[in-house]
């Protein structure tokens, strides 16, 4: 049975640990960590059948087969290389960190050197399977349009740097239009999906992103349009926000659970 370490005990990390604890995923939850001690306490209070050790990443990788990063883009810079150097596989939730091409290239090189796997869940979108299939031929364009309630963008670097008053937004308002390379840095907690699209498709500098604040919404909406040699497809998903964090879509947590289940499952279905 795979031994798992979960680094980051926020919304996604907590849902993932609960899924393991309930027996939904047949792996062993060996260790967890979060820089906020209270987050660890809150997580452990929700676990009924397991009592994982609390280990920092350097110790965690000595005992597990797979580390799941659920912390932040900044954490990726330490967690991922440390994990791969220890010859452990890694699942990355904060995929937006890989807009840094140097980090992306270095990470892939380390993984190849040590024979490790890096897993990027689909997150809060649908359509990555189609995009991956389409990438076998030429892709002309990939566009992501994200709509969320204004409060979902609180604290985002782009909002802070531009002194945007989210409370003053009364109608549908475009906050950002640009490339994924800029979007994942401007809204690191909101559009990790742009990173997944970029890596699976035509890259961070060619993937277009539009971010809209809409106070009428109670769900997070992601629309994707892909055009290429194959033709064209559009997907739209309306996500319920995660109960503990409105910046995160519940589907993102479910995607992490599904990815881990697929890793542990001998039967593989789909692209």
Curated annotation (Swiss-Prot):
Source organism of this protein record: Methanococcoides burtonii (strain DSM 6242 / NBRC 107633 / OCM 468 / ACE-M)
UniProt-listed InterPro entries: Asp/hSer_DH_NAD-bd, Asp_DH, Asp_DH_arc, Asp_DH_prok, L-Asp_DH, NAD(P)-bd_dom_sf
BP GO annotations: NAD biosynthetic process
Record carries keyword Oxidoreductase: yes
Active site: 222
Task performed by this protein: Specifically catalyzes the NAD or NADP-dependent dehydrogenation of L-aspartate to iminoaspartate.
Protein name: L-aspartate dehydrogenase
SUPFAM superfamilies: Glyceraldehyde-3-phosphate dehydrogenase-like, C-terminal domain (SSF55347), NAD(P)-binding Rossmann-fold domains (SSF51735)
HAMAP family referenced in this protein's UniProt entry, alphabetically: NadX
Enzyme superclass (EC): oxidoreductase
